[in-house]
């Protein structure tokens, strides 16, 4: 095992019980966040790649210029498809960015809450231990 891991392990063992629980809870939240964000990144890339590829094919093929210039029903339909594909690509990117921001904000808030609870629990345990020592010391 590496030195940094050994040091982390030693430091963890020296923590109070409540601090250990808080550390583990925060670690779980951050691991969960990483998994969710990673999944969103993959999904966002797939949607953007597919819609971007379709949009690029429509633009590169010149179908809109050839058939769209006719002004007929086919031309209008192809124009609508091209616009829809570009809108979907833009929307997918925006939705992905919003989703990542929401996950990061929720995880950050949850981690802060866990940290606050851990601090409160740690203080409560220390206060109880201090009170116990005071009462036994007075006898």
Curated annotation (Swiss-Prot):
GO biological process terms held by the UniProt record: photosynthesis
Single GO term (MF): bacteriochlorophyll binding
GO cellular component terms listed in the entry, alphabetical order: chlorosome
Keyword Lyase: no
Keywords: Bacteriochlorophyll, Chlorophyll, Chlorosome, Chromophore, Photosynthesis
Protein's recorded name: Chlorosome protein C
Pfam families, per database record: Chlorosome_CsmC (PF11098)
Major subcellular site: other
Subcellular location: Chlorosome
